[in-house]
């Protein structure tokens, strides 16, 4: 039996430790990573992929994939506890340490202000940004259809992040700071990493690696110096 009350209390405690102050200078950023988590075998296995890109060229230089036994069932609002063990396993293999990590999921745009981007950022003490494909909490004004349409994502008087249409005729992204990044800078960093697709390059590559998409296979074939491996911990 999962003690959900204790996990929610832990979320509130950890959320109080989140910093929304910018802790990185743009000139010091050499590598930005993207992280994506998925599940296999009817949820029995958790798979995390981390892609490391050189900044500002956004060239993929390293990837790591880890598969671990899933330790927690799916419980709404507690997803980060289910995902972070695989993220930590993939992170432990990274050789080119990034100065910033984009996580496919929520940052502080979470009912208890601790989405997976915030939780992971705290655990590894690295600046993080949540880049989600859907809204978990918060409200926003109607969004225009054009590329670049933008609205604040708010809960009462608190701004949690942004709703941004990164590509016309595509659903918007829900961007929120994870840890050691401000609300304003979270948006700016994501905008700096867009290269013609809906997703920013760090999480687009992480998704491609996790799913072993053709674009990733082609990159591996033409990039003999690319660092990367898959690791099973099951």
Curated annotation (Swiss-Prot):
Its cofactor is Mg(2+). The record marks 74 as: Interaction with target DNA. It is found in: Cytoplasm. Keywords: Cytoplasm, DNA damage, DNA repair, Endonuclease, Hydrolase, Magnesium, Metal-binding, Nuclease. Its main location: cytoplasm. Disulfide bonds: none annotated. GO terms for molecular function: deoxyribonuclease V activity; magnesium ion binding; RNA endonuclease activity, producing 5'-phosphomonoesters; single-stranded RNA binding. GO terms for biological process: DNA repair. One of its GO terms (cellular component) is cytoplasm. Mg(2+) binds at residues 36, 104. Its EC number is 3.1.21.7. It catalyses: Endonucleolytic cleavage at apurinic or apyrimidinic sites to products with a 5'-phosphate. InterPro entries: Endonuclease-V. Gene3D superfamilies: archaeoglobus fulgidus dsm 4304 superfamily (3.30.2170.10). It holds the Pfam family Endonuclease_5. Belongs to the endonuclease V family. DNA repair enzyme involved in the repair of deaminated bases. Selectively cleaves double-stranded DNA at the second phosphodiester bond 3' to a deoxyinosine leaving behind the intact lesion on the nicked DNA. This is Endonuclease V. It comes from Yersinia enterocolitica serotype O:8 / biotype 1B (strain NCTC 13174 / 8081). The lineage of its organism: Bacteria, Pseudomonadati, Pseudomonadota, Gammaproteobacteria, Enterobacterales.
């Amino acid at each position: 039996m999962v003690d959900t009350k204790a996990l929610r209390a832990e979320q509130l405690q950890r959320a109080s430790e989140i910093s929304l102050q910018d802790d990185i200078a743009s000139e010091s950023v050499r590598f930005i990573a993207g992280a994506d988590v998925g599940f296999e075998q009817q949820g029995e296995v958790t798979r995390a992929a981390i892609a490391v890109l050189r900044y500002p060229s956004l060239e993929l230089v390293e990837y790591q994939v880890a598969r671990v036994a899933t330790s927690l069932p799916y419980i709404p609002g507690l997803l980060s506890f289910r995902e972070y063990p695989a993220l930590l396993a993939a992170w432990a293999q990274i050789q080119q340490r990034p100065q910033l990590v984009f996580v496919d999921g929520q940052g502080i745009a979470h009912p208890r202000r601790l989405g997976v981007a915030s939780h992971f950022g705290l655990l590894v003490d690295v600046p993080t940004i949540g880049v989600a494909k859907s809204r978990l909490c918060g409200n926003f004004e109607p969004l225009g259809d054009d590329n670049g349409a933008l609205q604040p994502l708010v809960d009462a008087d608190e701004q949690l992040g942004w709703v941004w249409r990164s590509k016309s005729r595509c659903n918007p992204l829900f961007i929120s700071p994870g840890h050691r990044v401000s609300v304003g800078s979270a948006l700016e960093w994501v905008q700096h990493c867009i290269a013609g697709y809906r997703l920013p390059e760090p999480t687009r590559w992480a998704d491609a690696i996790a799913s072993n998409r053709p674009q990733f296979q082609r990159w591996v074939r033409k990039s003999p110096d690319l660092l990367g491996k898959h690791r099973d911990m099951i």
